[in-house]
């Protein structure tokens, strides 16, 4: 039987390297974090062969004392902690003393360093666990570490590496995360001798734009809030910027990139009302908290952490993001979709841009002068205006034309004749609506006939509400509205769905339940066994949502009351869908956790359906509701509720100004 024996140090280091250094990107992270801890203000990185053949990191930090340079390559040797209390309050990026020792055990490593008060630098080399004697070398103040031929002495490990291009991509991503977390440090990267990027020390906003991209910059909302000793800040993308990938999700805790389930769950919960299907949000979040409130000593790579009070962190992240997203009302933000981009997606041709004018004021800049309710203080974090050169005539968008058949022409004429036929009732209703909503508008009583131009009766641009006034209903689906300098298209069902949903949520929060209205005659329907079981299990909870159902026996249910807010909705279809939602609530979920999904289902039933003809006052009432409703830029499923076509885009379609 074999005897127990202590493993040699070089073998221990190679085993430890399996946890710390999985690939070149991990080695790069350990070295760069040492440079950050050394107080460097400039860090230069060179990679060869994707980091497999060479990783070279140079910094201008404080350097290593000549007497400590050999010790720096030994296991568990560090200057950052000395006691257990230091470990509990550690604020540095590294503290284990394992990184350099692990890298030195699986590569040919050269360490050169010089402190400011030293006349020359000191250099030491390590290969296969063996250290050379320190020698004098020429080097500016700071440190340079070269790790060559990674895993040269562990061929089995090297076989698990991917291609050089893939390993380089991981290294570049790792360096971008570190650069994003430390914008006050200048970073540069060279790949096989070619400069990839060179970032100067800059502000956080500038660094986010440089790393995450201009598209994120223009579609982001700035956040900054605190809760006691915790502070959360950064930028989150508007819901329409959401993608199917998670490559633009960054969480930093005390400037350390982490993958934390608590924070990610809070982000997901905040976006759940405004994201469509499987899309994921983009964000850059920084959480600062006392070092003793978080345990970073969970995993050797330090990307997994543990909060002392995870509930406090979750609440801060959720409420901060939820408030920022709730403030994306139609009176505060631009359209969630740009009509010019939509035209490009459909036709493949970009409309010719118009020459820029001096008056480039945003459509909603005057919204504060219009009585649409309380405004939020949330602003776009990175506003910018880009100018593009006019397109040549040949490439400008030309609308496709086709003749209508006689049947199509008659159908269209009949539709619009019926919709816009003049009646005294509609004229009186419209004038009353405008008088009630806008006191400064023309009164109901006709003014004496004069020679004053007709345009004098039209509201001035400063009097227009953010979403303007409805002028038509298109195809029974969309509302066409005119604002100050643009036309707006509103999906009436999607908009009404969001308005009803937010009203229901507010009513549930204020009263604890939805107001119900009893039916004069109960409506019965044949139910499945699952629907009957859901009623038996959740009858009281259903009543809280304004639905009163009773079991008539023989798999027959009767609807006796429905939510008053939903009006003339199909109560049977509503009851079936809500029962199905309740049936899906498993033992791991409560009704409260599933509440918003149930309310979203109910609001869909009570919203305007396609094909329903609306009067102008009804259309305008919906627009005003949108201006006062949180998250009204998206419906409950995350789809946009309105788009804008500016005057410049309209002119470009007709080649005006070419």
Curated annotation (Swiss-Prot):
**Which HAMAP family did the record assign?**
DNA_mis_repair
Q: Which GO terms describe its molecular function?
A: ATP binding; ATP hydrolysis activity; ATP-dependent DNA damage sensor activity; mismatched DNA binding
Family, per entry? Belongs to the DNA mismatch repair MutL/HexB family.
Give me the Gene Ontology terms describing cellular component.
Answer: mismatch repair complex
Know the name of this protein? DNA mismatch repair protein MutL
Q: Please name the Gene3D superfamilies in this protein's record.
A: 3.30.230.10, Histidine kinase-like ATPase, C-terminal domain (3.30.565.10), MutL, C-terminal domain, dimerisation subdomain (3.30.1540.20), MutL, C-terminal domain, regulatory subdomain (3.30.1370.100)
Keyword check for Disulfide bond:
no
- What this chain does, per the record? This protein is involved in the repair of mismatches in DNA. It is required for dam-dependent methyl-directed DNA mismatch repair. May act as a 'molecular matchmaker', a protein that promotes the formation of a stable complex between two or more DNA-binding proteins in an ATP-dependent manner without itself being part of a final effector complex.
């Amino acid at each position: 039987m074999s005897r127990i024996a202590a493993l040699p140090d070089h073998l221990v280091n190679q085993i430890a390297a399996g946890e710390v250094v999985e690939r070149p990107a991990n080695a790069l992270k350990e070295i760069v974090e040492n440079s950050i801890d050394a107080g460097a203000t400039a860090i230069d990185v060179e990679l060869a062969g994707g980091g497999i053949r060479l990783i070279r990191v140079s910094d201008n930090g404080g350097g290593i004392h000549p007497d400590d340079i050999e010790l720096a390559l030994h296991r568990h040797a560090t200057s950052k902690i000395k006691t257990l209390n230091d470990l509990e309050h550690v604020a540095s990026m590294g503290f284990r003393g394992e990184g350099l020792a692990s890298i030195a055990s699986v590569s040919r490593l050269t360490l050169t360093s010089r402190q400011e008060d030293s006349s020359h630098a000191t250099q030491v080399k390590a290969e296969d666990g063996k250290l050379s004697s320190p020698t004098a070398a020429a080097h500016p103040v700071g440190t340079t570490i070269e790790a060559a031929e990674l895993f040269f002495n562990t061929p089995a490990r090297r076989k698990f590496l991917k291609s050089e291009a893939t390993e380089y991509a991981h290294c570049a991503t790792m360096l971008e995360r570190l650069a994003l977390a430390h914008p006050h440090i200048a970073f540069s990267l060279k790949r096989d001798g070619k400069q990839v990027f060179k970032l100067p020390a800059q502000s956080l906003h500038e660094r986010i734009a440089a790393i995450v991209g201009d598209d994120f910059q223009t579609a982001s909302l700035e956040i900054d809030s605190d809760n006691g000793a915790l502070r959360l800040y950064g930028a989150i993308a508007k819901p329409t910027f959401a993608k199917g990938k998670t490559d633009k999700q960054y969480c930093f805790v005390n400037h350390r990139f982490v993958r934390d389930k608590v924070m990610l769950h809070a982000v997901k919960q905040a976006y759940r009302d405004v994201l469509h299907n499987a899309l994921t949000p983009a964000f850059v979040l920084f959480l600062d908290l006392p070092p003793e409130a978080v345990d970073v000593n969970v995993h050797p790579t330090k990307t997994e952490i543990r909060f002392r009070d995870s509930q406090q962190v979750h609440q801060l992240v959720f409420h901060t993001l939820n408030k920022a997203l709730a403030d994306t009302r139609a009176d505060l933000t631009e359209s969630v979709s740009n009509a010019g981009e939509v035209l490009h997606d459909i036709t493949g041709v970009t409309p010719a841009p118009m020459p820029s004018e001096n008056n480039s004021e945003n459509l909603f800049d005057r919204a504060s002068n219009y009585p649409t309710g309380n405004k939020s203080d949330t602003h776009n974090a990175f506003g910018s205006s880009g100018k593009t050169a006019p397109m040549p005539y040949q490439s400008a968008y030309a609308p496709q034309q086709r003749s209508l058949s006689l049947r199509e022409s008659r159908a269209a004429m009949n539709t619009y004749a019926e919709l816009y036929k003049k009646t005294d009732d509609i004229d009186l209703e419209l004038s009353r609506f405008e008088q009630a909503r806008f006191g400064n508008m023309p009164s109901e009583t006709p003014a004496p006939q004069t020679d004053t131009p007709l345009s004098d009766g039209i509201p001035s641009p400063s009097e227009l509400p953010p979403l303007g006034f409805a002028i038509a209903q298109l195809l029974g689906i969309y509302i066409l509205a005119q604002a100050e300098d643009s036309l707006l298209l509103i999906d009436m069902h999607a908009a009404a769905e969001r308005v009803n949903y937010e009203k229901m949520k507010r009513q549930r929060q204020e009263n604890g339940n939805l107001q119900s209205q009893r039916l004069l005659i109960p409506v019965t329907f044949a139910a499945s066994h699952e629907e009957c079981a859901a009623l038996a299990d959740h009858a009281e909870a259903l009543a809280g949502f304004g639905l009163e159902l009773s079991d008539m026996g023989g798999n027959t249910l009767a609807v006796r009351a429905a939510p008053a807010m939903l009006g003339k909705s199909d109560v049977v279809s509503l009851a079936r869908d809500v029962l199905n939602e309740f049936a899906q609530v498993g033992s791991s979920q409560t009704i409260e956790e599933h509440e918003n999904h149930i309310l979203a289902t109910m609001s869909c039933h009570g919203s305007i359906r396609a094909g329903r003809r609306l009067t102008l006052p009804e259309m305008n009432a919906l627009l005003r509701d949108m201006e006062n409703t949180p998250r009204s830029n998206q419906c409950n499923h995350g789809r946009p509720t309105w788009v804008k076509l500016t005057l410049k885009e309209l002119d470009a379609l007709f080649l005006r100004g070419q």
